[in-house]
């Protein structure tokens, strides 16, 4: 066995070979893709729409710009960005999972969003775009599933234009202890049951909960973005820190 194959990472609370995580995460999202939007509404009581709306407002995206919606899944952010950039702008919806990408493409086309959106199956760690290419990159509820987060952040930095910005919307660490206890009880006991009823897959939503707990907290992620080269990194807690929006610039 090579040294590289012995390198491990987390898959929820499990420790797995780095080479295996991508395949394991892919199975999760293949399983949940068809009910992904419904489950988001049920799990968050619809609040995910508020979090995403705030992200759009914080992005500063304008007409004629080029935006990368990374781990864009079913295209919620892409749909909004498409309107903001206009017919001469461009939005690239990228996702490593072909099932999610297919759902996003079908959903946006059903809504008549076709002219300025393209679709790319891509690994966040090795983005297939030129240097200094995008005005803005967003990654929404996707970074925690990436095997090598530091490498992915460096890849995002590379493809951003000078003056461009990265926004990372992700589950984080609640800042109030009572909220944290309620959140834990809901996440570990109720979410998997919802997943079992709606998707017939409790394990995928158990992984979701565990992956959130293993994700870097607010200050740690801020430091990782700075190490990747981003300047003026800041974050905003939402819903008591259950979710945080990190923002950084490339100068």
Curated annotation (Swiss-Prot):
S-adenosyl-L-methionine binds at residues 74, 95, 123-124, 140. Belongs to the class I-like SAM-binding methyltransferase superfamily. MenG/UbiE family. The keyword Isomerase does not apply. CDD domains: AdoMet_MTases. Pathway: Quinol/quinone metabolism; menaquinone biosynthesis; menaquinol from 1,4-dihydroxy-2-naphthoate: step 2/2; Cofactor biosynthesis; ubiquinone biosynthesis. InterPro entries: SAM-dependent_MTases_sf, UbiE/COQ5_MeTrFase, UbiE/COQ5_MeTrFase_CS. One of its GO terms (biological process) is methylation. It catalyses: a 2-demethylmenaquinol + S-adenosyl-L-methionine = a menaquinol + S-adenosyl-L-homocysteine + H(+); a 2-methoxy-6-(all-trans-polyprenyl)benzene-1,4-diol + S-adenosyl-L-methionine = a 5-methoxy-2-methyl-3-(all-trans-polyprenyl)benzene-1,4-diol + S-adenosyl-L-homocysteine + H(+). This is Ubiquinone/menaquinone biosynthesis C-methyltransferase UbiE. Its EC number is 2.1.1.163, 2.1.1.201. It holds the Pfam family Ubie_methyltran. Keywords: Menaquinone biosynthesis, Methyltransferase, S-adenosyl-L-methionine, Transferase, Ubiquinone biosynthesis. It comes from the Bacteria. The gene is ubiE.
């Amino acid at each position: 066995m090579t040294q590289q194959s012995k390198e491990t990472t987390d898959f929820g609370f499990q420790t797995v070979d780095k080479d295996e995580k991508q395949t394991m995460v892919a199975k999760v999202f293949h399983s949940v893709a068809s009910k992904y939007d419904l489950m988001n509404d049920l799990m968050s009581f619809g609040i995910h729409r508020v979090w995403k709306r705030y992200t759009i407002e914080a992005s500063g995206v304008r007409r004629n710009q080029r935006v990368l919606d990374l781990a864009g899944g079913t295209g919620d952010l892409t749909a909004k960005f498409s309107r903001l950039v206009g017919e001469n702008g461009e939005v690239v919806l990228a996702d490593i999972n072909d099932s999610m990408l297919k759902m996003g493409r079908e959903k946006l086309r059903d809504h008549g969003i076709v002219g300025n959106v393209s679709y790319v199956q891509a690994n966040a760690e090795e983005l297939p775009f030129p240097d200094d290419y995008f005005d803005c990159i967003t990654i929404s509820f996707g970074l925690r599933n990436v095997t090598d987060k530091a490498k992915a952040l460096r890849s995002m930095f590379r493809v951003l234009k000078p003056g461009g910005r990265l926004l990372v919307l992700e589950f984080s660490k609640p800042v109030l202890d009572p909220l944290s206890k309620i959140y834990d009880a809901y996440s570990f006991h109720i979410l998997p049951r919802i997943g079992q009823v709606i998707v017939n897959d409790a394990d995928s939503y158990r992984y979701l909960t565990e992956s959130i707990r293993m994700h870097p907290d607010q200050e740690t992620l801020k430091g990782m973005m700075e190490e990747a080269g981003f300047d003026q990194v800041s974050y905003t807690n939402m819903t008591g820190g259950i979710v945080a929006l990190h923002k950084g610039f490339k100068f």
